[in-house]
Amino acid sequence: MSWIEKILPRTKSPTKSNVPEGIWTKCGQCDAVLYKTELEKQLGVCPKCNHHMRVSARARLNQFLDQGERTELGSELEPKDLLKFKDSKKYKDRLVAAQKATNEKDALVVMQGKLKGMPVVVAAFEFAFMGGSMASVVGARFVKAVEACLEHNMPLICFSTSGGARMQEALLSLMQMAKTSAALAKMSEKGLPYISVMTDPTMGGVSASLAMLGDVNVAEPRALIGFAGPRVIEQTVRETLPEGFQRSEFLLEKGAIDVIIDRREMRDRLHSMLSKLHHQQA
């Protein structure tokens, strides 16, 4: 022991604090450390930089619809590996893994409920289920949502977040673009409003069909929206894309969408829109 150590009093190292795991998270945009409970109150929007984080389909539906009686539509539908598809992994194994990870049968959840007392049907994509890819069950559930609207004279809202068509279902997946578009045409014929809300990301076959067919096309701030991704486009055209290309602000400026709405204002703003649209078309 050195002479300095003999003079100085010994200090005890601070004991490790008993902070429970999982109560903090980090913003992917500004790196701010956030209290999860506070983030939930903000509906998954960073209070520091306004970054809209991805939320699960059920969390979004719980945030958006009134508490109380809700009916899930199409929950009995389950995906099947009709093509016996295999890439680096069997499709049926990918389905099992996705179902286990998300506790969902497929990538779209549909609920019939109320928005500030107004009867509505709301569909929400689950991005954690194979990138929110559109396949046979997704298309069938969306059609069930439309059929419920037609039967009960209700408006439809869809929150999209998807990488596009599910390649493991090949042509069966691509068929859903036409199937969902044809269903929405029936809503239009009957004069029932459909509001499409595009969240980050909304790409591929979903953006090329049901996501862009709203009577009002809404987007969350800074959402990536397009068909092919920016890297693919840059490699194809061999040019550098403009700053913010394919982000919702860029699309609004070019007239591709109608409005950008903060998630925390979504209930009030969409209820206001539907009050006018449904009244006019009733």
UniProtKB/Swiss-Prot annotation:
<dbReference type="InterPro" id="IPR011762">
    <property type="entry name" value="COA_CT_N"/>
</dbReference>
<keyword id="KW-0067">ATP-binding</keyword>
<comment type="function">
    <text>Component of the acetyl coenzyme A carboxylase (ACC) complex. Biotin carboxylase (BC) catalyzes the carboxylation of biotin on its carrier protein (BCCP) and then the CO(2) group is transferred by the transcarboxylase to acetyl-CoA to form malonyl-CoA.</text>
</comment>
<dbReference type="GO" id="GO:2001295">
    <property type="term" value="P:malonyl-CoA biosynthetic process"/>
</dbReference>
<keyword id="KW-0863">Zinc-finger</keyword>
<dbReference type="GO" id="GO:0009329">
    <property type="term" value="C:acetate CoA-transferase complex"/>
</dbReference>
<dbReference type="GO" id="GO:0005524">
    <property type="term" value="F:ATP binding"/>
</dbReference>
<feature type="binding site">
    <location>
        <position position="49"/>
    </location>
    <ligand>
        <name>Zn(2+)</name>
    </ligand>
</feature>
<feature type="domain" description="CoA carboxyltransferase N-terminal">
    <location>
        <begin position="23"/>
        <end position="282"/>
    </location>
</feature>
<dbReference type="GO" id="GO:0003989">
    <property type="term" value="F:acetyl-CoA carboxylase activity"/>
</dbReference>
<comment type="similarity">
    <text>Belongs to the AccD/PCCB family.</text>
</comment>
<feature type="binding site">
    <location>
        <position position="46"/>
    </location>
    <ligand>
        <name>Zn(2+)</name>
    </ligand>
</feature>
<keyword id="KW-0479">Metal-binding</keyword>
<feature type="binding site">
    <location>
        <position position="27"/>
    </location>
    <ligand>
        <name>Zn(2+)</name>
    </ligand>
</feature>
<keyword id="KW-0547">Nucleotide-binding</keyword>
<dbReference type="Pfam" id="PF01039">
    <property type="entry name" value="Carboxyl_trans"/>
</dbReference>
<dbReference type="InterPro" id="IPR034733">
    <property type="entry name" value="AcCoA_carboxyl_beta"/>
</dbReference>
<dbReference type="GO" id="GO:0006633">
    <property type="term" value="P:fatty acid biosynthetic process"/>
</dbReference>
<keyword id="KW-0443">Lipid metabolism</keyword>
<keyword id="KW-0444">Lipid biosynthesis</keyword>
<keyword id="KW-0862">Zinc</keyword>
<keyword id="KW-0276">Fatty acid metabolism</keyword>
<dbReference type="GO" id="GO:0008270">
    <property type="term" value="F:zinc ion binding"/>
</dbReference>
<feature type="zinc finger region" description="C4-type">
    <location>
        <begin position="27"/>
        <end position="49"/>
    </location>
</feature>
<dbReference type="InterPro" id="IPR000438">
    <property type="entry name" value="Acetyl_CoA_COase_Trfase_b_su"/>
</dbReference>
<comment type="subunit">
    <text>Acetyl-CoA carboxylase is a heterohexamer composed of biotin carboxyl carrier protein (AccB), biotin carboxylase (AccC) and two subunits each of ACCase subunit alpha (AccA) and ACCase subunit beta (AccD).</text>
</comment>
<comment type="pathway">
    <text>Lipid metabolism; malonyl-CoA biosynthesis; malonyl-CoA from acetyl-CoA: step 1/1.</text>
</comment>
<dbReference type="Pfam" id="PF17848">
    <property type="entry name" value="Zn_ribbon_ACC"/>
</dbReference>
<dbReference type="InterPro" id="IPR041010">
    <property type="entry name" value="Znf-ACC"/>
</dbReference>
<keyword id="KW-0275">Fatty acid biosynthesis</keyword>
<keyword id="KW-0963">Cytoplasm</keyword>
<dbReference type="InterPro" id="IPR029045">
    <property type="entry name" value="ClpP/crotonase-like_dom_sf"/>
</dbReference>
<dbReference type="GO" id="GO:0016743">
    <property type="term" value="F:carboxyl- or carbamoyltransferase activity"/>
</dbReference>
<protein>
    <recommendedName>
        <fullName>Acetyl-coenzyme A carboxylase carboxyl transferase subunit beta</fullName>
        <ecNumber>2.1.3.15</ecNumber>
    </recommendedName>
</protein>
<keyword id="KW-0808">Transferase</keyword>
<feature type="binding site">
    <location>
        <position position="30"/>
    </location>
    <ligand>
        <name>Zn(2+)</name>
    </ligand>
</feature>
